């Protein structure tokens, strides 16, 4: 699995301007949907928000990786977004997140999201 196989040009947004964490998640969900990776955007976003309730995916150093497994996902995929002004994503270091990678995996897809996180970490 390669990052370039998971990330389509239509799922990338530079100079985004979400104001809140929820805005950022909705914007990334829209990018994921534009890439053709979702069968049910609302179901996927519900899973992402549920995942965020268990703990923020704001990693620190300006990076966030919101993700979820969901029946609303057709295939494993990525969406990417740059937010120059940053968004408070409740990161461990308290700094705003500026670089976002949203990870989508189909429900029951073993550890696909973990594999994608691992690949992102080595970039």
Show which residues each predicted segment covers.
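Cytosolic covalent-transfer regions centered on His/Cys nucleophiles
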Residues: 1-123
């Amino acid at each position: 699995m390669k990052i370039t196989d998971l990330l389509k040009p239509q799922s990338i947004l530079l100079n985004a301007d979400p104001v809140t964490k929820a805005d950022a998640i909705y914007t990334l969900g829209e990018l994921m949907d534009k890439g053709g990776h979702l069968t049910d955007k609302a179901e996927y976003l519900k899973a992402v928000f549920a995942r965020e309730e268990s703990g923020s995916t704001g990693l620190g150093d300006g990076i966030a990786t919101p993700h979820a497994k969901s029946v609303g996902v057709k295939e494993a995929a990525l969406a990417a977004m740059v937010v120059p002004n940053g968004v408070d994503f409740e990161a461990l270091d308290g700094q705003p997140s500026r670089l976002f990678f949203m990870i989508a995996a189909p429900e029951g897809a073993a550890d696909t999201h973990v594999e994608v996180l691992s690949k992102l970490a080595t970039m």
